[in-house]
Amino acid sequence: VGDNFFMNVYGKLMDSGKITIGNNVFIAPNVSIITEEHAMDAVQRAQGLEYTHPVTIGDNVWICTGAIVLPGVTIGDNSVIGAGSVVTKDIPPNSLAVGNPCRVIRTLEQE
């Protein structure tokens, strides 16, 4: 976890795998960051088999209320993830990304 990190109430870090969080990251209420997933095969799932994939959150990122960040995702520096978004794939730096599945709708200019 980097400097000047803030996570609001009811946030969840499901960290069986590694979560890396940069500097100046703000996480709103009810955000979930998940690093593990269950096997798709029913027999393996019943045996409790899980896989983990790291999550990386860059510097100056804001993740808005109720967003879910799924295993293996990287969110690039200076990006904003909209409220209620489900981040299933990497988000490039300087992006405003929203929706389910989350997609980039605009590039953010840095001042």
Segments (PLM) and residue ranges:
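Gly/Pro- and small hydrophobic-enriched strand-loop and loop-to-helix capping segments
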Residues: 88-94, 111
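Short beta-to-alpha loop/turn elements within the nucleotide-binding domains of ABC transporters
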Residues: 73, 84-85, 91, 100
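Conserved active-site beta-strand element of glycosyltransferases/polysaccharide synthases
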Residues: 97
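Helix-turn-helix DNA-binding module
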Residues: 76
